Amino acid sequence: MDFKQHIAIVPDYPKEGIVFKDITPLMNDGKAYKAATDAIVEYAKERDIDVVVGPEARGFIIGCPVSYALEVGFAPVRKLGKLPREVITVDYGKEYGKDVLTIHKDAIKPGQRVLITDDLLATGGTIEATIKLVEELGGVVAGIAFLVELTYLDGRKMLDGYDVLVLEKY
């Protein structure tokens, strides 16, 4: 399926100079959303995944249906102050600012094979931080899946040594 026809291009969002790739049209089309989910599920099945991890918020949109289809758990990665129990944290930079990400300390057991999902790979800051959280808990990053990669931002360099699936590139 050509997923690009289901991704809207929004200039100057969330701030001037950023060209945002909006996946909500893909989510609004049940067949396209299912096809994207199915492609990631097939990728994950080859990697013997124990848990899916996704950073908020769009990583949830991708990761939850994948974890459901695989019949494995989903562990959310959230901004500081959004998870109610004991967490580990990591500072990170992203395309348009800096922030802190967290995950529950008990979200991943040592040795578990993890699939990280997110909507978009831009500069790689969010995914690099998510990898650090997973690995600090002893998880093994068995795969990383994105709907979209912005190749001109060179975020892929953060992922050397990791197995990556991207459905569409810009």
Swiss-Prot record:
Note the superkingdom of the native organism. Answer: Bacteria
Q: Give the pathway listed in the UniProt entry for this protein.
A: Purine metabolism; AMP biosynthesis via salvage pathway; AMP from adenine: step 1/1
The record, for InterPro entries, names:
Ade_phspho_trans (IPR005764), PRibTrfase_dom (IPR000836), PRTase-like (IPR029057), UPRTase/APRTase (IPR050054)
Q: What is this protein called?
A: Adenine phosphoribosyltransferase
One molecular function GO term is: adenine phosphoribosyltransferase activity
Gene3D superfamilies per the record?
3.40.50.2020
Q: What would be the name of the gene that encodes this protein?
A: apt
Tell me the classification of the organism that encodes this protein: Bacteria, Bacillati, Bacillota, Bacilli, Bacillales
Q: Which family does it belong to?
A: Belongs to the purine/pyrimidine phosphoribosyltransferase family.
In the UniProt record, does the keyword Disulfide bond occur?
no
